[in-house]
Amino acid sequence: MYLIINKMIYKLFSEENMDYSDIKLNVNINKFNEPELPQEKYGYDFKLNDYRNKIDNINSDNWKKVRWYINEYDFQVKDPIINRAFYKYWEIINEFEIYEEYTEKDVILHCAEAPGGFIQGTNIYLQIEYLNINKDKQIKKIEIDNSGFIMVKSKKKLNNNNYKIYTISLNKELPQYRNYNLPSYNKNIINKHLCITYGKDKTGDMNNLDNIEYINNISKVPFYLITADGGFDEGTDFNNKEQLHYNLILSEIYAGIYLQKQNGHFILKVFDTLTETSVHLIYLLTLCY
């Protein structure tokens, strides 16, 4: 599930002309011996959870293979499209008109993004914007192709193709990550517009806030669009995926709040949102957008 959070307004702070450059947030989630319990008032279903618990009795490798094969959409991706994330992103940016107020001076940040489905989507979208096939200033608002996908809908063409994309993901070349089966950035997304960074400590870890500060320093300007598509293999602990991702999601929210320009857009991937902590994380976003 993705949260599409529009229009950064900095509601956390009362002074309209306040300088935000020196603001630091204390990012921390208390750790408990047992995972936080989901609650019915947030949509938790005991019957569904009983069925999910049965997965624990299945060999994890077999379960992953079966899960892939029973999902009819897992094998729909065809070259040169990198993965299904591209299609998710493509639908989001068109349905919510994310680039409606984008200008040539704006910059984009894609976090936790390898192999680069979202980056590929941004590349293709902005390059289409620059194509001068139709001399008319107006382009049709919306079209659907033969496969049912929304085509680019835009009201304007941009004047040049000097857009800039920044991205950060875990550095798979480091010894501590070599057993994680991390993806590499796909060659189809590498171009002059893309700046790949692994942060101050060269790990690409979003949980190290120094790496977020490093992005702020190299970009020099706040970001029009920030996406956070982070996630990791929960192993055999399927039912606690939500709880296991608390720290990562909080760090991504911190990055969004700290690095976003006013009136910018933030796309955040979350999993289940059935616990008090998840609700608080979402509430934090409502204070700022």
Question: Where are these predicted regions, by residue range?
Answer:
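Short coil/turn segments at secondary-structure boundaries
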Residues: 120-125, 178-182, 231, 237-242, ...
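Intrinsically disordered, low-complexity glycine/charged-rich regulatory or linker segments
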Residues: 1-218
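Conserved Class I SAM-dependent methyltransferase catalytic core
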Residues: 239-289
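Short interface patches used for recognition in eukaryotic signaling and trafficking proteins
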Residues: 72-77, 105-107, 235-242, 265-272
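Beta-strand-rich binding-surface signature
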Residues: 86, 105-108, 162-164, 220-227, ...
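Helix-boundary capping/turn motifs
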Residues: 81, 226-228, 257-261
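Active-site-proximal loop/turn and secondary-structure-junction residues that shape catalytic pockets
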Residues: 171, 232, 272-274
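Conserved proline-anchored active-site loop of SAM-dependent methyltransferases
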Residues: 109-114, 218-236
